[in-house]
Amino acid sequence: MSRPQRISVLGATGSIGLSTLDVVQRHPDRYEAFALTGFSRLAELEALCLRHRPVYAVVPEQAAAIALQGSLAAAGIRTRVLFGEQALCEVASAPEVDMVMAAIVGAAGLPSTLAAVEAGKRVLLANKEALVMSGALFMQAVKRSGAVLLPIDSEHNAIFQSLPRNYADGLERVGVRRILLTASGGPFRETPLEQLASVTPEQACAHPNWSMGRKISVDSASMMNKGLELIEACWLFDAQPSQVEVVIHPQSVIHSMVDYVDGSVIAQLGNPDMRTPISYAMAWPERIDSGVSPLDMFAVGRLDFQRPDEQRFPCLRLASQAAETGGSAPAMLNAANEVAVAAFLERRIRFSDIAVIIEDVLNREAVTAVESLDQVLAADRRARSVAGQWLTRHAG
């Protein structure tokens, strides 16, 4: 290798970004940070810039950029600080960049992720909303540009590892019967149904196995996360919703499975640590040390599986329906969920209201065809508006 590969980490201060930079730091001969971006944790971004000395840093606003530029200059760091969405797209698509970690949470990450794809980069996709919102457009851009798209979600990474290399020829053609998408069931898997309305944001964010941000923790608690992953799996692996089955697996040791027509089931197992799928995607088709401890099968002891309870997890049903409907439905589902989760974290609504808001939006808004990014973003805006109207009527 003549030089280290340059990586832009979009969402560097989040859990995925920090895990990515941990892998970068373990392999300075292989990787170096080209650009780091942050949204609200600007002190953390400054610390990361001091440690990794990227060429660029990106923040949301000009005032923050001026402040960070001054701090870094005073420390003798020559990182150039940019601001705004256009800057995100620029560092995602810059000619010097070899790979992009797309880890900005939610719809906000779509434009920069798409910019990386259109520039033909190796894209490490942690932003599931990009595929949920604009699946057909996104995958068309991948094929058109020749980008290498590698999934970072532990489940999709596990599926990728468990499929044959020629899966793009068609799942049935390569002998796949179905994809088994595992889910921990979150912190409320066994909570009495009558208590779900009164659970707190703190309880929802206390995931039993994974360390995650607040939004994705709530999505895991409602199993909307798994619903979004079902939609993502359909686009990544050219599967029909009927070919993807969600299985609750409380230990989070099996990260997903592929069931073949000959009766074989191939699975990927490992400790629940995002550095495993991140390092796999960074080094693919090679493998490198991720810093993750080996899996102790004797300590695991047993593996349990359950069917999801639709009464307990209505968000999973809504996501499955959106996947079947297609068009703008997944984008509206995602937008309504983002609004509802934010309101729950602000204690404006109950946990059980999240699914109510999403269903209200899907019932009120007509599904349209999606043929451009503008149409995707328009559907997103409409859904957010309808969800906001629900909050105005019902929330504090």
Curated annotation (Swiss-Prot):
Cofactor(s) in the UniProt record: Mg(2+); Mn(2+)
Binding site for 1-deoxy-D-xylulose 5-phosphate: K128, S154, E155, S184, H207, S220, N225, K226, E229
Pathway participation: Isoprenoid biosynthesis; isopentenyl diphosphate biosynthesis via DXP pathway; isopentenyl diphosphate from 1-deoxy-D-xylulose 5-phosphate: step 1/6
Keywords: Isoprene biosynthesis, Manganese, Metal-binding, NADP, Oxidoreductase
InterPro entries on file: DXP_reductoisomerase, DXP_reductoisomerase_C, DXP_reductoisomerase_N, DXPR_C, DXPR_C_sf, NAD(P)-bd_dom_sf
Enzyme class: oxidoreductase
Family: Belongs to the DXR family.
GO MF, any single term: 1-deoxy-D-xylulose-5-phosphate reductoisomerase activity
Pfam families: DXP_redisom_C, DXP_reductoisom, DXPR_C
Binding sites annotated in the UniProt record for NADPH: T13, G14, S15, I16, N127, E129, G213
Protein name (Swiss-Prot/TrEMBL): 1-deoxy-D-xylulose 5-phosphate reductoisomerase
Catalytic activity: 2-C-methyl-D-erythritol 4-phosphate + NADP(+) = 1-deoxy-D-xylulose 5-phosphate + NADPH + H(+)
Enzyme Commission number(s): 1.1.1.267
An individual GO BP term: isopentenyl diphosphate biosynthetic process, methylerythritol 4-phosphate pathway involved in terpenoid biosynthetic process
Positions bound to Mn(2+): D153, E155, E229
Function comment: Catalyzes the NADPH-dependent rearrangement and reduction of 1-deoxy-D-xylulose-5-phosphate (DXP) to 2-C-methyl-D-erythritol 4-phosphate (MEP).
